[in-house]
């Protein structure tokens, strides 16, 4: 952008240049000639050296005035300062009317000065009054977009519904595009608007009143009723009394919902099967408990037998210890069995003694042995016989 404050200071430093009255006016044009472009580039470089900030396109957009053209030709010849290049001419009435018509529909027309207005009128709201009053060049901005194009763009935006982040490609809810009408009740003479009705009523195009009415006159003058199962109108002959569903669909509905009652024979068979199943489960439980009792008793019996046999073995080991007391002269000897003392005598009296010992031993064995265990009984009898044989052998050997 142009440095307006610098331009204003430049005008204060250098007096304005007066254009001679006999200067030939060049033909008006919107674009500068080649000579003017070369001279403007020289002046632009000079202004950049002096501290002015001019855009490259600022001179190309605004054509120079007659005074500026004369100034371009006399700047270097007369020695005047080149700072008066901001003078522009007022366009002809035809061009002014064209730009005024184009700027009429421009929303930013209040920022653009009309041809013939001063810089102070358009820049007073942006710059201080002192600086705006000192800058007096006249210029204008051409409208880049016409009002017709802008109106067309706004119309297209409203039709497309492009509203900055909102998906409005389709019309809003409740609205209908061109050629479409809101759903209405299909009953004869009923034009109820179903836009705000329930989705069910909008879908089947029936209002709430006619969906429950017993008789509805539809198109063609037919007396019908709305079926709640089929969601459409049927003739009155297809309904039973005041039912709201037709006969066919109501029968299907009842068959699905209701369950048939079982017969007496089926109930008896089911009861017997249940009783048999319960009895079998009970027998199985009793047999398992009985087997457990037998196993527990057998284990206890085996454990008791083992303990008893251990005690008997210890007793027999002690009873097998035989103490013999022999007389030094060899006349008499005495054998002592554990708990069974007897004296030796002649050979004739040996058998009764053996019989006495046998009877005593048998009685002792009967006292300590349990009669229910045959195996242990045979074992102890065999050991007793061996003990008796040993005693008889000792007696015979002594005599």
Curated annotation (Swiss-Prot):
Residues 1-28, 250-292 are annotated as: Disordered. Pfam families: SBP (PF03110). GO terms for cellular component: nucleus. Zn(2+) 2 binds at residues 227, 230, 234, 246. Its main location: nucleus. SUPFAM superfamilies: SBT domain (SSF103612). Keywords: Developmental protein, Metal-binding, Nucleus, Zinc, Zinc-finger. A zinc finger (SBP-type) spans 182-260. Zn(2+) 1 binds at residues 185, 190, 207, 210. One of its GO terms (molecular function) is DNA binding. Leaf ligular region, blade and sheath. Residues 261-270 have a biased composition (Basic and acidic residues). It comes from the Eukaryota. Gene3D superfamilies: Transcription factor, SBP-box domain. InterPro entries: SBP-like, SBP_dom, SBP_sf. It is found in: Nucleus. The keyword Signal does not apply. A motif (Bipartite nuclear localization signal) lies at residues 243-259. Involved in the formation of ligules and auricles during leaf organogenesis. The SBP-type zinc finger is required for the binding to DNA. This is Protein LIGULELESS 1. It comes from Zea mays (Maize). The gene is LG1.
């Amino acid at each position: 952008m142009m440095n307006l404050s610098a331009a204003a200071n430049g005008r204060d430093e250098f007096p304005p240049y007066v254009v001679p009255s006999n200067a030939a006016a060049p033909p008006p044009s919107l674009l500068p000639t080649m000579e003017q472009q070369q001279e403007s580039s020289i002046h632009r470089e000079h202004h950049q050296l002096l501290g002015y900030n001019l855009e490259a396109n600022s001179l190309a957009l605004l054509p120079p005035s007659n005074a500026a053209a004369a100034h371009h030709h006399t700047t270097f010849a007369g020695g005047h300062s080149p700072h008066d290049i901001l003078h522009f001419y007022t366009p002809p009435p035809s061009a002014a009317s064209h730009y005024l018509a184009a700027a009429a529909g421009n929303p930013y027309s209040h920022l653009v000065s009309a041809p013939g207005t001063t810089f102070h009128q358009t820049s007073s709201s942006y710059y201080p009054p002192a600086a705006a009053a000192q800058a007096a060049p006249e210029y204008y901005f051409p409208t880049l977009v016409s009002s017709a194009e802008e109106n067309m763009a706004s119309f297209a935006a409203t039709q497309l519904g492009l509203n900055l982040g909102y998906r409005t490609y389709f019309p809003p809810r409740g609205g209908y595009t061109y050629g479409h009408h809101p759903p209405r009740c299909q009953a004869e003479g009923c034009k109820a608007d179903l836009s705000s009705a329930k989705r069910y009523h909008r879908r089947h195009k029936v209002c709430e009143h006619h969906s429950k009415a017993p008789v509805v006159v539809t198109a063609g003058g037919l007396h019908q009723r709305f079926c709640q199962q089929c969601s459409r109108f049927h003739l009155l002959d297809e309904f039973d009394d005041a039912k709201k569903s037709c006969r066919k669909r109501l029968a299907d509905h009842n068959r699905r919902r209701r369950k048939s009652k079982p017969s007496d024979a089926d109930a008896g068979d089911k009861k017997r099967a249940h009783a048999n199943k319960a009895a079998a489960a009970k027998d199985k439980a009793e047999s398992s408990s009985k087997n457990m009792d037998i196993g527990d008793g057998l284990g206890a019996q085996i454990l008791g037998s083992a303990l008893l046999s251990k005690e008997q073995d210890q007793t027999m080991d002690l009873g097998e210890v035989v103490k013999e007391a022999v007389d030094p002269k060899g006349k008499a000897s005495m054998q002592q069995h554990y708990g069974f003392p007897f004296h030796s005598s002649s050979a004739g009296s040996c058998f009764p003694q053996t019989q006495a010992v046998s009877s005593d031993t048998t009685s002792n064995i009967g006292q300590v042995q349990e009669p229910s265990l045959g195996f242990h009984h045979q074992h102890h009898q065999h050991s007793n016989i061996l003990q008796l044989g040993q005693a008889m052998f000792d007696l015979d050997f002594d005599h």
